Amino acid sequence: MRMKKFAWTLLALLALCLPALAGAEETSLVISEAMSRNPAIWQLDYQDYIEFYNAGDTALELSDYTLCRGDNLEKKCCLPARTVQPGEYAVLLCDGSEITFSLPKEGCRLTLLCGEETANTLTLPALQKGEVWTRENGVSMQPSPGYANTDEGGAQWYQSTQRALAFSEALSCNVSTMRQEYEYYDMLELCNTSGGKLQLSDFYLTDDLAEPLKWQLPAREINPGAYYTVFASGLGGKQANFKLSASGETVYIFRADGTIVDAMRIPALRGDESYGVWRGLYYYYEKSTFGKDNGAGARGVSAAPQMSLETGLYNQPIAVSLSGEGTIYYTTDGSRPTLKSKKYDGTAIAISDTTAVRAMCVKDDYLASDVTTRSYLYGMEKYELPLLLITGKYDDLLGGNGIYKNYKNRRQEAAINLTLVDEGQMAFSVDCGVKIHGNSSRERPKKSFQIRFRSKYGASTFTYPLFEHAGVDTFHSLILRSGSEDQNRSFFRDEFLGSLTRETMPNVLYLDYKPVNLFVDGKYYGIYYIRERTDTTYVSQHLGGDDEQVDIINSWQDLEQGSMGDWSRLNTFCLRKDLTDPANYNEVLSQISLDGFIDYYIARAYSGDRDYCNIRVCRSRAGDNRWYIVNFDLDWGFTIAKTPLVSMLGKVSNTSSLNNVIITGLLKNQDFRAQFLSRMALHLSTTFDTQRVLSRLDEMVAEVAHDMPYNQDRWGYSMEKWQEYVQLLRDFVQDDQGTRVMEMMQDAQRLFSLSNDEMTAIFGEMWTNGR
């Protein structure tokens, strides 16, 4: 009897507790939607927001609740007085008036309190611009503030605002869709969703809310339901004067009076993919549908698969398992997986030799995922330098039609995965493009490569702290230098001189480097230097401004980027004008980095580079608008032992290039000559101090010495010859005849006709002590 009474008492207590337990999981008021980075919902004044839903059967007062942010409820906000009926939604803005704290883009924990009790909790994930979290669907690009978190609710929200002219579709990475004037430009499609004709010139497009009338549409009528395609080339005129970023962009339509008509957040898109609206819902399209009804597309992009083992060094057979949503397709030959590749059936992949596994997921109603690449390396413990792996389709890389055999084709590029393994661990893995790099060096057996980060492969830039001294970690392109024309000699002349000047010549642009062992589709290709490349991103990062405001000019007046008009005019000015005239002299100084020009020619002369006419200059028009010289292509350095300054500054033959005009013109000016000699004395005592140079040379040798035998064996070069060429570098710096520093001073005396007293005044003890 006592046991029966105890059982009934326990049941009664459980009955009392169950509602409280249920309330912790399913409360009447729940957080149903949230956006932490709102760039496009103008109806909410572009504010972040949180939506609450009354899931109960009685009305609720928001003022009974407190919203908290943080694991320890650090931020608290009493919700405003508002009645929420059963089945109704309430949208509150995180603008300081309704919710007093913001939603961090990296995500946060939200807790809803009713009195002292927890009513609802949510871990809001990190969101990209325009992404929304909903209780039913997780993260997507389909907002529905104030409406059900369903397709029907999303369409109702979109259609609740009348858009006379609406964005219909966008393509931000145009690889092969609808060429215009021999170029593939970004594209936007507009649709007349009003009931009558519209005059397009009444509307403006922009990618910047601070400039709502950035580009006026052309004068043209558009019928109801008709489409109009805009090419976002950045050129202006009949084409939009802005471009679209493949990593994500927000675009807006305004009327002349500043009234907004429509806005659309375009997510990150891959090559030829588009993003658009159909019947009030947002879709991704594998192929664009410009000029016609979009139809239903994909609801998103599949998440990339996971692999059970990471890239690394292995010495025993392994089994690699794949996991992910949807169907997984994979390859083991280096090629990129497609829908025709092998399907993963759940059986682990057996691996006992160097192999790259590449896989992608395809979920129903979603686009294929990005490709996951992992490389499993055998027999590579012997290498000391980091390992850089190029993985791709054999035919595209090393086959008869690949880039290596067709090295004369400067445009041919192959899609690859680039992976760096450092100290046995994967440092990064990125999809990108590769092509052969160089001029005459591409004829050599060991070729240099150019790495290009493009939207059609993945991201258009690559961010990683790759270099120790560069000061930047975002790249649009990189070079894999083979040693170029120095590959069968000392191998690192170019890197050596750059390493000497990087700290002491800050106004000479320096290309940082990192030595690695390169493997192409599992085959050893020797020691390479990963190098910065002088592209628009490099210049804008080092000199300021953006990529559109950069000019880059190669040797022999070859324009690479921007405009060369100002550079040509400067050379002509120096050729025709008397630079001893202070006005003319100051005009030149206003256009160049003075210390940079002086230091560059001192460094080049010290190195005895016989290819001295091959220079590269650049500037940022948004920076100081001055021309800077880049320290590059020094494979023929340390070869002219005598008369280095005379050879460099135009007193011998083979100096007909305009590249010498500025420096030789400036040296006619006594003030400039004095500054040139002063800086020469400074650098001979610091940058090119004999012991400093020899110590740096020892460091360069030690860095590659362990792995150099493998490089030499791969390309048929001997270690004995390499060591001989390294010794020649040492002898160049100092031998039994004296030092390079002394040769430089003696040549300066000859070139400028200086007396011994003048030399002593300029160079001090370096001259008097004969060192």
Task: Label every model-predicted segment.
Residues 30, 92, 139-166, 170-173, ...:
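Short, compositionally stereotyped local motifs that mark structural "simplifiers"
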Residues 74-99, 212-237:
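Intrinsically disordered, low-complexity Pro/Gly/Ser/Thr-rich segments with frequent PxxP/GP/PP motifs
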Residues 100-152, 239-290, 430-442:
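Conserved beta-structured recognition patch
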Residues 274, 289-298, 386-387, 395-400, ...:
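Middle-to-C-terminal accessory/interaction subdomains
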